[in-house]
């Protein structure tokens, strides 16, 4: 028995609880065993007992446990332990990260979690959902400019047009602003409007939705000019008049000539949360500014007449003193403020792990139903054991060996049951890190041909991880959770749950069995997607690939 000083939060968190230690690298049978910590009365120290473990030189050399009390030598083989269940831990031919891994063993006595699980960079990720993407203005700044009748530049994603539009509130347009739009834009001036206003003005779609062959299915209506106060309809003054007439709640169908020089667009209800386009972004910004739901938008062109891309847009914005914002930031801004789910039903549900209360939540955005399994009483909502699990049909239902999803789900439910209090939120629509079941199976074929899980998605032209956790955060808030011990290996999930009035007070790692089928997958998640598998030397065992991708299947 050796005495150590639990100055590290990792040791303090594990005091009095058995843990499993696995030496990094090629794991040998001799490396498996257990380490028990127990507090010393009237002392800040704890005793540590090694059982069934061949002590490695790196234990002492690397200082895996703080303090100088450890005295074992490099070749010591401590007594075998019968309490270790081999099927719960990596096998002899497994390959793990080079860092040491500490895995808490859960008992009915309670649950402790690792505190220093992610780097400061990971902890800061998306904590403030109002913080703009680097190089962009904040959405709140753009809203203020919209309120003042100013133009802003809105940029969409590279997977769409990757272009910038000049946008302003239609109700505040002036001939001078319109002249600026015509000068630096394509000349095709659009006004995005809600469906009820288009119906009120009898402005039908140019083509039926199912016949729309435009690349992004932009919903153009018939074009118009205002009858009163215009001449040809093409001048900046005439176009401003038409826009003002469209934005007026008092306008009538007979106030317009058809066709004309202004292109009304149909806004999709739900805005950027439903469709991440400029049409939806412009109306969302107008409404967030407290103005009528109509906005002017026009694509910005470069000096040679080509579409201006982001580098040129930044130069243009600085020269003209315009704010530039991204639709991605607007989506995050709205996700923080809009109610995304509604509780639809609740029932007692007996599971193989024990009885829980099952809560069904329906997304108000897409109608997808999600479920939360609640064990015990949430009470004050502090320190609740939580798992936010992404749907994986192949792993969760059919036990696919390609991933560790089913194992993580079962382990999380077992931990919650033993702790006697906790929540598992099961998010549907997250299949294959958001790419869907069909694409996931296509990615599997590419993995069989030699790609890893990241490369396969990229070869299919799909994002490495497109999941959002705002719905999960809102479900937790509705259930009364305020602070949580999060069961995850994924830094992106840590960041994705911050910013919704929730705090994360610790992490519980989920280290599942490694097999010949999922070994490369798990290693790719570590090296390219930033996953953390336990704690070493008081620091997170964490690497982020050069592409910065982060995710958990």
UniProtKB/Swiss-Prot annotation:
It catalyses: D-ribulose 5-phosphate = (2S)-2-hydroxy-3-oxobutyl phosphate + formate + H(+); GTP + 4 H2O = 2,5-diamino-6-hydroxy-4-(5-phosphoribosylamino)-pyrimidine + formate + 2 phosphate + 3 H(+). Keywords: Chloroplast, GTP-binding, Hydrolase, Lyase, Magnesium, Manganese, Metal-binding, Multifunctional enzyme, Nucleotide-binding, Plastid, Riboflavin biosynthesis, Transit peptide, Zinc. It comes from the Eukaryota. Mg(2+) 1 binds at residue 161. Residues 1-56 form a transit peptide. GO terms for biological process: riboflavin biosynthetic process. Its EC number is 4.1.99.12, 3.5.4.25. It holds the Pfam family DHBP_synthase. Disulfide bonds: none annotated. The record marks 261, 299 as: Essential for DHBP synthase activity. It is found in: Plastid, Chloroplast. Binds 2 divalent metal cations per subunit. Magnesium or manganese. Involved in riboflavin biosynthesis. Catalyzes both the conversion of D-ribulose 5-phosphate to formate and 3,4-dihydroxy-2-butanone 4-phosphate and the conversion of GTP to 2,5-diamino-6-ribosylamino-4(3H)-pyrimidinone 5'-phosphate (DARP), formate and pyrophosphate. In the N-terminal section; belongs to the DHBP synthase family. This is Probable bifunctional riboflavin biosynthesis protein RIBA 2, chloroplastic.
């Amino acid at each position: 028995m050796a005495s150590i000083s639990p100055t590290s939060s990792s040791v303090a968190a594990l005091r009095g609880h058995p843990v499993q230690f696995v030496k990094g690298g090629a794991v040998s049978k001799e490396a498996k065993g257990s380490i028990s910590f127990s507090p010393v009365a009237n002392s800040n120290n704890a005793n540590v007992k090694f059982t069934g473990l061949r002590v490695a030189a790196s234990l002492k050399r690397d200082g895996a446990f703080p303090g100088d009390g450890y005295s074992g030598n490099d070749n010591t083989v401590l007594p075998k332990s019968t309490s270790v269940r081999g099927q719960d831990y990596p096998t002899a031919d497994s390959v793990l990260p080079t860092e040491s891994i500490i895995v808490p063993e859960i008992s009915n006595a309670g649950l402790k979690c690792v505190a220093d699980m992610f780097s400061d960079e990971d902890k800061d990720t998306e904590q403030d959902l109002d913080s703009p993407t680097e190089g962009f203005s904040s959405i709140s700044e753009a809203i203020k400019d919209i309120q003042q009748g100013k133009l802003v530049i809105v940029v969409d994603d590279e997977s769409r047009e990757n272009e910038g539009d000049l946008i302003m509130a239609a109700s505040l347009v002036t001939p001078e602003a319109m002249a600026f739009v015509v000068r630096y834009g394509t000349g095709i001036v659009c006004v995005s409007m809600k469906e009820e206003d288009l119906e009120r003005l009898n402005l039908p779609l140019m083509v039926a939705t199912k016949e729309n062959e435009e690349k992004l299915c932009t919903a153009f209506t018939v074009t118009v000019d205002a009858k009163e106060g215009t001449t040809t309809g093409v001048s900046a003054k005439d176009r401003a008049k038409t826009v003002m007439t469209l934005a007026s709640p008092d306008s009538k169908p007979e106030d317009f000539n058809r066709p004309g020089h202004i292109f009304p667009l149909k806004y999709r209800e739900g805005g950027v949360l439903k469709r991440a386009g400029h049409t939806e972004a412009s109306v969302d910004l107008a409404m967030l500014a407290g103005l009528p739901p109509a906005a002017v938008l026009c694509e910005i062109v470069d000096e040679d007449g080509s579409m201006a891309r982001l580098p040129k847009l930044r130069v243009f914005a600085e020269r003209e003193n315009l704010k530039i914002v991204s639709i991605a930031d607007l989506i995050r801004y709205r996700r923080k403020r809009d109610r995304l789910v509604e509780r639809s039903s609740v029932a007692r549900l007996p599971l193989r792990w024990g009885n829980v209360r099952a809560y069904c939540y329906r997304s108000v955005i897409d109608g997808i139903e999600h479920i939360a399994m609640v064990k015990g009483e949430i009470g004050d909502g502090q320190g609740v054991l939580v798992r936010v699990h992404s749907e994986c049909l192949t792993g969760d239902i059919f036990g696919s060996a390609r991933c560790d999803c089913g194992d993580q789900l079962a382990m999380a439910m077992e931990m919650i049951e033993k702790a006697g209090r906790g929540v598992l939120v099961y998010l549907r629509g997250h299949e294959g890190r958001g790419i869907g079941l069909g694409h996931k199976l296509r990615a599997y074929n590419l993995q069989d041909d030699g790609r890893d899980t990241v490369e396969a998605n990229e070869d299919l032209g799909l994002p490495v991880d497109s999941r959002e956790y705002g719905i999960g955060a809102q479900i937790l808030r509705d259930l009364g959770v305020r602070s949580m011990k999060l069961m995850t290996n994924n830094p992106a999930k840590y960041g994705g749950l911050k910013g919704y009035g929730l705090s994360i007070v610790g992490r519980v790692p989920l280290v599942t069995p490694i097999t010949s089928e999922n070994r490369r997958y798990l290693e790719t998640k570590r090296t390219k997607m930033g996953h953390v598998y336990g704690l070493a030397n008081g620091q997170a065992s964490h690497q982020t690939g050069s592409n910065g991708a982060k995710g958990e299947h």
